[in-house]
């Protein structure tokens, strides 16, 4: 049973940390100045307008390359898929009213009658076919790695078709929740800048460079009209600015909060904080493109370095208990996930092992994109100090949102050693996350479509065998063995599963934060 989101209780007297933080902010008026100057239109939202403040820039309403969870809330309001993953992490029907496995390698699908785009044109079988082909051609796509293979479309009627695969893909109904449908004539194998979709909202204005959008009700929407007239999306990278703007009423909802900010907001008049367990894993993942002979190409060295990291202190003192240390290679909240081990802190052992492996005096570069997870900079700085204590010199490289970190992830931008990265559980299944991270092949690596260069043939074969197993119990057994095998390759220096935190004004009602760190905009209403 998936725990339901809940409101955090009002705090007791403010902690010293909170008092110091508020003192540093210097007051509402001061903070709103720079926010207003750099983040677009200001002032309290109108009575029918919902304003969202995102911590990362939403460069497109197309999800082919966008990877951060909160973007899904907005993208799905404009474009829709055949299915979606509900709050119970089970697939639900959207554009399809039938989605059934009819053989191990075929699924029968029927489009819902009357589904249409915001320009009034119908959603067609050809649009689904084109969407799958366009997603399949995008280089560097996070979503592409989730599919063991991309299905093909075989039309069987005006609204019906078969999705066929060479081998069984028993979770295809879940995977298709990631494929947003666009009119075929407007779709291309790239991140689309246009916003035509079948969702409850249409795009009124868009500035992908600034991460700002205005959405209005889609009067042609085939379903029930949403309660909110207009939605404004703003990119506000500084968390302190998001907090102040929420308190002042300039923003209605802010996502991905640190515990400090949640503590500041909980119990304030007119503000509520929501928390739910998450299905995202955040990792300090090793670069698996290192040549033979490099210390990090040796799993024993990767393992030795993990003893340098005091994960308990990071959880308690830096993340303030807003996360749980990973006990597996995927979050345990995912269906099919199993415990495979824990990260142990033992700096003496780290030093001894590194010395025995002739890997003393290592120098490593750790990179990440700002906003990858709440408190990311503080975590990275603490990790540098911990590595220093065992004789490893680490340098940090931080990328701003919207930059070229994708090239670096693919090994095209330059060399690095460890990356701070979050991987979402978009389908609620451990299998999908395992496929996306550990299903790399030599063929995928030629186009840099692997996860940080992770290509271990025996792991891929084991994963492929599990992924095509149609018997659920047998699949879970194979997946359990696979997860232990992956753990033994030591893919991460450290990893954790963050809880999902969100804050909203009291006038925002009906917002149900889901474990995938998004929510359904059609359920949100404004009161007062």
Which residues does each predicted region cover?
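Ligand-site clamp/hinge motif
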Residues: 189, 219-264
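Surface-exposed binding/hinge segments that line
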Residues: 100, 144-185
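Extracytoplasmic/peripheral linker and loop segments enriched in polar/acidic and small residues
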Residues: 393-404, 435-505, 528
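Long beta-strand-rich cores associated with HINT superfamily self-processing modules
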Residues: 502-528
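Gly/Pro-rich hinge or "lid" segments in bacterial periplasmic/extracellular proteins
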Residues: 90, 174-226, 230
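N-terminal lobe/hinge region of extracytoplasmic solute-binding protein
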Residues: 54-102, 133, 196-197
């Amino acid at each position: 049973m998936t725990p339901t989101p809940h409101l955090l209780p009002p705090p007791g007297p403010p902690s010293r940390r909170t008092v110091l933080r508020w003192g540093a902010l210097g007051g509402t008026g001061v903070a709103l100045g720079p926010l207003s100057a750099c983040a677009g239109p200001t002032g309290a939202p109108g009575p029918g307008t919902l304003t969202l403040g995102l911590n990362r820039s939403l460069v497109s309403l197309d999800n082919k390359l966008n990877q951060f969870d909160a973007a899904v809330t907005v993208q799905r309001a404009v474009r829709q898929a055949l299915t979606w993953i509900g709050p119970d992490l089970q697939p639900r029907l959207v554009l399809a009213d039938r989605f059934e496995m009819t053989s191990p390698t075929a699924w029968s699908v029927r489009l819902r009658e009357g589904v249409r785009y915001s320009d009034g044109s119908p959603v067609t079988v050809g649009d689904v076919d084109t969407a799958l082909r366009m997603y399949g051609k995008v280089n560097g796509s996070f979503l592409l790695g989730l599919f063991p293979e991309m299905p093909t479309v075989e039309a069987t009627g005006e609204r019906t078709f078969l999705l066929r695969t060479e081998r069984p893909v028993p979770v295809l109904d879940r995977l298709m929740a990631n494929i947003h449908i666009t009119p075929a004539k407007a779709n291309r194998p790239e991140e689309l800048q246009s916003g035509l979709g079948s969702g409850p909202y249409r795009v009124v204005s868009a500035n992908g460079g600034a991460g700002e959008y205005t959405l209005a009700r889609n009067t042609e929407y085939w379903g029930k009209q949403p309660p909110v007239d207009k939605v404004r999306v703003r990119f506000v990278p500084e968390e302190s600015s998001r907090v102040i703007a929420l308190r002042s009423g300039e923003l209605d909802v802010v996502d991905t909060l640190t515990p400090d900010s949640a503590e500041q907001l909980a119990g304030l008049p007119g503000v509520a904080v929501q928390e739910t367990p998450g299905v995202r894993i955040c990792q300090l993942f090793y670069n698996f493109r290192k040549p033979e002979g490099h210390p990090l190409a040796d799993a024993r060295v990767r393992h030795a370095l993990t003893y340098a990291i005091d994960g308990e202190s990071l959880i308690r003192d830096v993340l303030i208990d807003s996360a749980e240390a990973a006990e597996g290679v995927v979050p345990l909240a995912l269906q099919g996930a199993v415990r495979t081990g824990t990260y142990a802190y033992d700096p003496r052992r780290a030093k001894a092992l590194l010395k025995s492996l002739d890997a003393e005096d290592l120098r490593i570069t750790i990179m990440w994109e700002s906003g990858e997870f709440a408190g990311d900079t503080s975590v990275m700085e603490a990790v540098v100090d911990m590595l220093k204590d065992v004789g490893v010199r680490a340098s940090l490289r931080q990328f701003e949102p919207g930059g070229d970190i994708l090239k670096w992830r693919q090994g095209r931008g330059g060399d690095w050693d460890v990356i701070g990265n979050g991987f979402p559980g978009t389908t609620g299944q451990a299998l999908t996350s395992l496929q996306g991270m550990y299903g790399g092949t030599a063929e995928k690596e030629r186009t840099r479509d692997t996860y940080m260069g992770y290509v271990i043939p025996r792991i891929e074969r084991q994963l492929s065998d599990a992924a095509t197993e149609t018997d659920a119990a047998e699949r879970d057994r194979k997946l359990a063995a696979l997860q232990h095998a992956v753990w033994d390759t030591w893919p991460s220096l450290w990893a954790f599963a963050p809880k999902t935190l969100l804050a909203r004004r009291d006038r925002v009602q009906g917002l149900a934060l889901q474990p995938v760190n998004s929510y359904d905009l059609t359920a949100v209403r404004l009161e007062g």
